[in-house]
Swiss-Prot record:
Residue segments, region 12 X approximate tandem repeats of [AV][DE]X[VL]SGSX[DE]QX[KR]X[ST]: 83-243
Signal peptide bounds: 1-20
Organism: Chelonus sp. nr. curvimaculatus
Feature: compositional bias, Polar residues: 112-123, 217-228
Name of the protein in its database record: 33kDa venom protein
This protein's record includes keyword Secreted: yes
Tissue specificity field: Expressed by the venom gland.
Cellular component terms per the entry's GO annotation: extracellular region
Record carries keyword Secreted: yes
């Protein structure tokens, strides 16, 4: 009888263990999903693929073994050195961040230096532009002065031309008077000497007017030379307008 009881108890235990309705695993798996810990990410298809106290659950579209206990440490993993490894990793990340920050500082300084260089170049270009503007103003001023000198010379030349014409008219009038005197002059005993004196006087006056006429022509030629010189200077100033300052 004792042997049959033992066999019956073992059969009952196996039947209960393999029953799909009741399982000892259901007693140890927590009902709150957030408390379940992924153990080694072992894939499974049923609870039997996992160890005791574990359940097969779908996480991120993958069936893995989970349970209410902390995961076992990996083989050959020194738990005491986990803190040191984390500290070393943090230290390396900190050094990398500091190196990256230093690199950014250097790039920032280089950019500031480049910006300062551009500012200096811009200031130099502005100064050159101002110098070109001053030179252009000076050339325009010289051109205006040349125009004024040319107009003054032309006015003086016109005045000399008027004086020359006036002298020529006066000379023609004296020539007419000379001819009239010569026509009226007749050899007479009492009037012959007087006529000769008047004739000499008229010739002297005519000669004086001829000298004044020659002087006026010389003065006109001098003003013509001055006008030509002013025209040449004005043309030189006009050529300066075409000068382009690099």
């Amino acid at each position: 009888m004792a042997g049959k009881e033992v066999i019956f108890i073992m059969a009952l235990f196996i039947a209960v263990e393999s029953s799909p309705i009741f399982s000892f695993d259901d007693l140890v798996c927590p009902s709150v999903t957030s408390l379940r810990v992924n153990v080694e990410k072992n894939e499974c298809s049923t609870k039997k693929d996992c160890g005791r106290n574990l359940c097969c659950e779908n996480q991120n579209k993958i069936n893995v073994c989970v349970g209410g206990i902390m995961p076992l440490p990996k083989p050959n993993l020194d738990v005491n050195n986990i803190g040191g490894a984390v500290s070393e990793s943090v230290k390396q990340k900190r050094e990398t961040a500091e190196s990256l920050s230093g690199s950014f500082d250097k790039e920032k300084a280089s950019a500031e230096n480049l910006s300062g260089s551009f500012d200096q170049q811009k200031s130099s270009v502005d100064e050159k532009s101002g110098s070109v503007g001053q030179q252009k103003g000076a050339v325009e001023g010289q051109s205006g002065s040349g125009e004024q000198r040319r107009e003054t010379a032309e006015s003086q030349s016109g005045s000399v031309d008027q004086e020359k014409a006036s002298a020529e008219n006066l000379s023609g009038s004296i020539d007419k008077q000379k001819v009239t005197v010569e026509e009226k002059s007749e050899p007479a005993q009492g009037q012959s000497g007087s006529v000769k004196q008047k004739r000499k006087t008229t010739e002297n006056v005519s000669g004086s007017l001829d000298q004044e006429k020659a002087s006026a022509e010389s003065l006109s030629g001098s003003f013509d030379q001055q006008k030509s010189s002013v025209d040449e200077k004005s043309g030189s100033v006009g050529n300066d307008d075409d000068i382009s300052v690099q």
